[in-house]
Amino acid sequence: MQHSRVLTMFAVPELDSPALEIPLYLSPAACGFPSPAQDYVEQTIDLNQLCVEHPAATFYVRASGHSMVQAGINDGDLLIVDRALKARHGAIVLACLDGEFTVKQLQERPYPALMPANPDFAPIYLQEGQELEIFGVVTFVLHKTKLG
């Protein structure tokens, strides 16, 4: 069984930070031939409003390791974690198991477990006497695209 380090940094967002409004093109971006008639901005969006539903309960953490790659979480990605959300079956969570942080998919049934999203890693089935604390639900993953 492989283990991965997942938690490398916490950073709490500033609650009074100004809005960062970015142009939003309302026409969907086709992954085929673009339409030149649809290249105008219709509104702007604030990334804080889009990504942070509960500012006082939201924080960022940097992912480390490869156990969640099939869930779109890569080594070095920035995760947005919301402590106000209830962790449910199937949610990707930041958990602390016996004092070690990990990001995994929460499985509540048929047996409680923390599931990786990479077949090279084994599920973590919760055993009697283990301490599990869910720190929050991962709501967004931010990563750069691979260039060239």
What do the predicted segments below correspond to?
Residues 113-119:
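Catalytic Cys-His active-site segments of thiol-dependent hydrolases/isopeptidases
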Residues 75, 97-102, 132-133:
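Short coil-to-beta-strand transition motifs
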